[in-house]
Swiss-Prot record:
<keyword id="KW-0375">Hydrogen ion transport</keyword>
<keyword id="KW-0812">Transmembrane</keyword>
<keyword id="KW-0406">Ion transport</keyword>
<keyword id="KW-0472">Membrane</keyword>
<dbReference type="InterPro" id="IPR000245">
    <property type="entry name" value="ATPase_proteolipid_csu"/>
</dbReference>
<keyword id="KW-1133">Transmembrane helix</keyword>
<feature type="topological domain" description="Lumenal">
    <location>
        <begin position="171"/>
        <end position="180"/>
    </location>
</feature>
<feature type="transmembrane region" description="Helical; Name=4">
    <location>
        <begin position="150"/>
        <end position="170"/>
    </location>
</feature>
<dbReference type="GO" id="GO:0033179">
    <property type="term" value="C:proton-transporting V-type ATPase, V0 domain"/>
</dbReference>
<comment type="function">
    <text>Proton-conducting pore forming subunit of the membrane integral V0 complex of vacuolar ATPase. V-ATPase is responsible for acidifying a variety of intracellular compartments in eukaryotic cells.</text>
</comment>
<dbReference type="Pfam" id="PF00137">
    <property type="entry name" value="ATP-synt_C"/>
</dbReference>
<dbReference type="GO" id="GO:0000139">
    <property type="term" value="C:Golgi membrane"/>
</dbReference>
<dbReference type="InterPro" id="IPR002379">
    <property type="entry name" value="ATPase_proteolipid_c-like_dom"/>
</dbReference>
<feature type="transmembrane region" description="Helical; Name=1">
    <location>
        <begin position="27"/>
        <end position="47"/>
    </location>
</feature>
<dbReference type="GO" id="GO:0005789">
    <property type="term" value="C:endoplasmic reticulum membrane"/>
</dbReference>
<feature type="transmembrane region" description="Helical; Name=2">
    <location>
        <begin position="67"/>
        <end position="87"/>
    </location>
</feature>
<feature type="topological domain" description="Cytoplasmic">
    <location>
        <begin position="48"/>
        <end position="66"/>
    </location>
</feature>
């Protein structure tokens, strides 16, 4: 009976997560930060671009001024790259004897959580900016006075990505590796 309990404890998720190197969590967090941010930017560019091309057939004058929506989507990818660079500078060398100390695990988890926060905030931001950019292109093709009004809404949608970057930077401040 005690063998079953010991086996159950050894195979628990908590025990498995503690055995994974904090550097692995850090690397996954950095990859999620940049990868998911670029995915959000690409998705937003796709949504905006397809509507812009379709609406430009009817009203060619909207093409150049509605490219700002694509630039807002590209900014989302840049947010992810910037945070990935910041997170990478948080990595430090730790002696193998202190690799699984609580401080090392906390640093690895903090970088991982920061990457997840930034990545998925930028994914949502890219979708938001893409949908609003699509609406901006379609409405501008019908009524050119709506462009500036919808552009203001797009700026507020872009703030979602900035909020994610701010929270990610604050979260990454918790990543302190043990000293030698």
């Amino acid at each position: 009976m005690s063998g079953v309990v010991a086996l159950g404890h050894a195979s628990s998720w908590g025990a498995a997560l503690v055995r994974i190197s904090p550097y692995t969590f850090s690397a996954i967090g950095i990859a999620i930060s940049i990868g998911v941010s670029v995915l959000g930017a690409a998705w937003g560019i796709y949504i905006t671009g397809s509507s812009l091309i379709g609406a430009a057939i009817e009203a060619p004058r909207i093409t150049s001024k509605n490219l700002i929506s694509v630039i807002f989507c590209e900014a989302v990818a840049i947010y992810g790259v910037i945070v990935a660079i910041i997170l990478q500078t948080k990595l430090e060398s730790v002696p193998s004897s202190k690799m699984y100390d609580a401080e090392s695990l906390r640093a690895g988890y903090a970088i991982f959580a920061s990457g997840i926060i930034v990545g998925f905030a930028n994914l949502v931001c890219g979708l938001c900016v893409g949908i609003i950019g699509s609406s901006c292109a379609l409405s501008d093709a019908q009524n050119s006075t709506l462009f500036v009004k919808i552009l203001v809404i797009e700026i507020f949608g872009s703030a979602l990505g900035l909020f994610g970057v701010i929270v990610g930077i604050i979260m990454s401040a918790q990543a302190t590796w043990p000293t030698k």
